Regions:
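N-terminal signal peptide c-region/cleavage motif recognized by signal peptidases
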Residues: 17-19
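Hydrophobic helical h-region of N-terminal Sec-dependent signal peptides
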Residues: 10-11, 15
Length: 268
């Protein structure tokens, strides 16, 4: 996979935003889940782009992969962040074992997980409530719409999304979907944080992501995490396999508009 020709100019333009260090910073990720899950392709896309950027910034990124059946006894000490495509029960168990490490949820939409407010689970994928709220907002303006709510879609073109979709399709010969975008976003927001801060400890990265993150994600808004760990983000509304608009829906959502979607509070 060669991203270099396409992206050297892009990397040169963003160098001024990051700190360049003399020594090489090596960052390790681990993915826990099935190899067939589409989030893994997004993770790999993010890793490729991060390593391309890292050539200019003296940073290297690597990825290990295991299934949920192989986590017992695995040494997680070297990983800056954990990327998962597992169910709610498995995700809770992983987060409990790795309480000072960012554990990214790339797949589970459970509202209960957001109510739990587990301190180290970071939900990239939107909750069911976020999608439901987005559709309810659309119904106010378009009562007859049969749209579905997505976090990503292969026809999305705004905010440089077209370029991301093209890069992904070229590399993996499939269309980027919700899960593959989530995998890409988790890696990219972490590597961008490393570029800006040179963080090497997982506990420091968790603190940064929860409290200082601003991430575009090719969605045109500065995304960050709620106290319950959910990533604030636009929701794409898709009808007939095309993006027709985004939520929060203008003229319907009340400010702060991104918080008009989904769960804000913890149960306890």
């Amino acid at each position: 996979m060669k991203l270099k020709k396409y992206n050297y100019l892009f990397c040169a333009l963003i160098l001024s935003s990051f700190n360049i260090t003399a020594g090489v910073i090596e960052t390790n990720f681990i993915y826990i889940g099935e190899s067939s899950h589409p989030s893994l392709l997004g993770v790999k896309q993010g890793l490729d782009e991060s390593n391309l950027q890292g050539e200019f910034l003296n940073q290297k990124y690597s990825l290990d992969e295991i299934t949920i059946d192989n986590i017992d006894g695995h040494d997680f000490s070297k990983y800056l962040a954990v990327l998962t495509s597992v169910n709610s029960k498995e995700l809770r168990n992983i987060a409990k074992q790795l309480s000072e490490t960012p554990v990214f949820n790339l797949a589970d939409e459970s509202d209960e997980l957001r109510h739990d407010c587990t301190k180290n689970i970071l939900h990239i994928t939107p909750s069911k409530q976020m999608k439901s709220d987005a559709l309810m907002q659309l119904k106010v303006k378009k009562p007859d719409s049969n749209a579905t709510a997505k976090s990503w879609h292969h026809t999305f073109v705004k905010f440089a999304a077209r370029d991301l979709n093209k890069r992904f399709k070229k590399n993996y010969h499939v269309k980027m979907d919700d899960h593959s975008w989530a995998g890409w976003a988790a890696v990219k927001m972490t590597s961008d944080a490393v570029a800006r801060t040179q963080i090497t400890k997982s506990s420091d990265m968790l603190e940064y992501l929860k409290n200082e993150l601003t991430f575009d994600g090719q969605k045109g808004s500065n995304m960050n995490f709620r106290k319950n760990g959910q990533l604030r983000q636009l929701i794409l509304l898709v009808e007939n396999d095309k993006v027709i608009t985004e939520a929060p829906v203008r003229g319907v959502a009340k400010p702060p508009t991104l918080d008009s979607l989904g769960i804000l509070d913890c149960k306890n």
